[in-house]
Amino acid sequence: PGFEHYRFDLIYIDGDHTEEAVFNDGLSAFMVCRVGGYILFDDYEWREETKRGIDRFISVHANQINIIKKGYQVLVQKTSN
């Protein structure tokens, strides 16, 4: 059992900092984030690998999110499925 039947207003991502893990965490979060909800990525400016994973997520979902803040943390709002 997982979270696939739930929808969340805010999801905070601060786990494995490899590019692939951050990207996959973003994809998983996007699936369970409600439209209008937020995904917050930590450590964007900490390691290049982490930054690449977050940038990949943003690129894939560019038409479905708004970037609210981009600094040490990145906050995006989901605008559509």
Language-model features: where?
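Short beta-strand-to-loop acidic/aromatic patch adjacent to the donor-nucleotide binding site
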Residues: 10-13, 39-40
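A short acidic, Gly/Pro-enriched loop at the edge of an enzyme's catalytic core
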Residues: 2-11
